[in-house]
């Protein structure tokens, strides 16, 4: 949004700074979040788009997840009411390690491949000097995905994957399917290619 940068803090590393869930309960962002909640309520209640799902991004801890949900409730967005579902972006190692604790508060997760990869192996995906280390075949990264799918599904939580990797690699698609992923989300321009890849398995 034009002018938005005027209200952003100057951070050395914004990728792990004030982003995602940490904004939603902050006094510095509460009015903007209230507007976001009003827009969601309008879409669901007035326009009858009850299939609209709330997704909480970059949520670092279960206690933070609880706080965001409580803040949403003050703005009239209550999980389970009028079929409202709440999903979590699973893109931080803590989302995987504490999956059993997050799972009681949410209905689904979407594994964010790009952030989960860079935060698992400590690689800045925007750094040209170490970009070669950002490999989706990395064992730690694959284990994180496997752990996330297994634990969340054990707790009755739907698990999806979003990111470019399934579009670029048939092998990665097969890995996700073998791990019993529920859904794979891709950008519109990648949809046909991904469907073709899945059809080859």
Language-model region placement:
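Conserved alpha/beta-domain cores
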Residues: 1-201
